[in-house]
């Protein structure tokens, strides 16, 4: 395996040299640098003591947690032997010492940190460490669903989860049967698919967590490029679980682009999409702390758009779903107008309205559908 050295954040990382990332014997995706930037900022903000990077590949995520955060104990795991050996090389490259190896596990003891690298199945590792970790990061190829039960048992009752889902085609309705099978939910196609897909993912996590009398607080959830990313704080107790379940519900949309959603355990009429999460997609204080950290932790920002993206999320109105102005124009026989003009008109009418990260042609607003259409006619 031919290797090249790259730098991301404070980490120096050996990664496989390959024409295409999917051809490499150990997976490394440079596009996910922004994902890793935000994850490092999140761990900095939350200050967990024990962190698990359950699906490590090159180890770049776990290495950055080790180098850039205050976590006292960082575990990295992969089932691939090539990945395991590569993580050991990367540990030595960054810390100057060889980890002690025994029985498929390596450990590196530093003055203020304990670093552990495990060779094995992620579900097995999490099952063997019941309520041990304060923060578990799941960054799989595809869906995180197969790891949810183990992660929810392995994380502490008031711990944190960071999850990535790259099966956007499934969650966005291109593979409807797969979404029903994996997420037990009906997906929607069209301009709302990315937000609805993200909310289906969160809704699934809520249902899994509720089995263990765990509630869910969404600290941050977003869509970007080819993936969804969610940061959650778990809340212990049946009452907290019930409160989270009560924020699940369904979405309807007609041919004009008008949508309706309602929080309920069962859909009130036919044609529903879901179940899905209808609660907040961000904790404003948490998100503002991430933005603050980008200004004081420049070494942790490797992607040029991290600050810009987080700033957009801070300003975004946190209401369910959005209106795509191009789709509304097409469906209602209107001319496309500038988003800035629509937002200004809605503000002048006394409504809130912002851009959204889900689409460059969409707005989030608390204005009724008819008012949004009128604002596009002026």
From Swiss-Prot:
Keywords for the protein's UniProt record, in alphabetical order: Methyltransferase, RNA-binding, S-adenosyl-L-methionine, Transferase, tRNA processing, tRNA-binding
Catalytic activity of the protein: guanosine(26) in tRNA + 2 S-adenosyl-L-methionine = N(2)-dimethylguanosine(26) in tRNA + 2 S-adenosyl-L-homocysteine + 2 H(+)
GO BP annotations, alphabetical order: tRNA N2-guanine methylation
Domain Trm1 methyltransferase: 4-376
EC number from the UniProt entry: 2.1.1.216
Annotated residues for binding of S-adenosyl-L-methionine: 36, 61, 78, 121-122
One of the record's GO molecular function terms: tRNA binding
EC category: transferase
Keyword Cytoplasm carried by entry: no
Assigned protein family: Belongs to the class I-like SAM-binding methyltransferase superfamily. Trm1 family.
Protein name listed in UniProt: tRNA (guanine(26)-N(2))-dimethyltransferase
Source species of the chain: Thermococcus gammatolerans (strain DSM 15229 / JCM 11827 / EJ3)
Lineage: Archaea, Methanobacteriati, Methanobacteriota, Thermococci, Thermococcales
UniProt gene name: trm1
């Amino acid at each position: 395996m031919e290797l090249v050295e790259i730098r991301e954040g404070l980490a120096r990382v050996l990664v496989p040299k390959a024409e295409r990332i999917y051809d490499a014997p150990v997976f490394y995706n440079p596009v996910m640098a922004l994902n890793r930037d935000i994850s490092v900022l999140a761990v900095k903000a939350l200050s967990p003591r024990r962190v698990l990077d359950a699906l490590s590949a090159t180890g770049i995520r776990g290495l950055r947690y080790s180098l850039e955060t205050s976590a006292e104990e960082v575990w990295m795991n992969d089932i691939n032997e090539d990945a395991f050996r590569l993580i050991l090389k990367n540990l030595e490259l960054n810390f100057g010492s060889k980890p002690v190896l025994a029985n498929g596990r390596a450990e590196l003891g530093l003055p203020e940190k304990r670093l552990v690298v495990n060779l094995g199945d992620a579900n097995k590792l999490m099952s063997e460490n019941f309520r041990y970790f304060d923060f578990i990061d799941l960054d799989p190829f595809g869906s995180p669903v197969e790891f949810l039960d183990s992660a929810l048992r392995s994380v502490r009752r008031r711990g944190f989860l960071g999850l990535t889902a790259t099966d956007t085609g499934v969650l966005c309705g291109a593979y409807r049967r797969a979404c029903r099978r994996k997420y037990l939910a009906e997906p929607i196609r069209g301009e709302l698919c990315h937000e609805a897909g993200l909310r289906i993912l969160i809704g699934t996590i809520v249902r899994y967590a509720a089995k263990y009398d765990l509630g869910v607080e969404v600290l941050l959830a977003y869509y970007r490029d080819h993936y969804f990313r969610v940061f959650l704080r778990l809340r212990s107790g049946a009452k907290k679980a019930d409160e989270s379940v009560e924020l699940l519900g369904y979405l309807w949309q007609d041919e004009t682009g008008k949508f309706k959603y309602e929080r309920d355990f069962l859909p009130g009429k036919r044609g529903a999409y879901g179940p899905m999460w209808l609660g907040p997609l961000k904790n404003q204080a948490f998100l503002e702390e991430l933005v603050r950290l980008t200004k004081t932790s420049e070494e942790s920002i490797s992607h040029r758009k991290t600050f810009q993206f987080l700033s957009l999320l801070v300003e975004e109105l946190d209401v369910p779903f959005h209106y795509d102005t191009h789709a509304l124009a097409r469906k209602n026989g209107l001319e496309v107008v500038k988003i800035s003009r629509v937002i200004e008109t809605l503000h002048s009418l006394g409504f809130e309205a912002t851009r959204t990260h889900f689409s460059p042609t969409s707005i989030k607003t608390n204005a009724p559908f008819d008012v949004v259409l009128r604002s596009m006619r002026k």
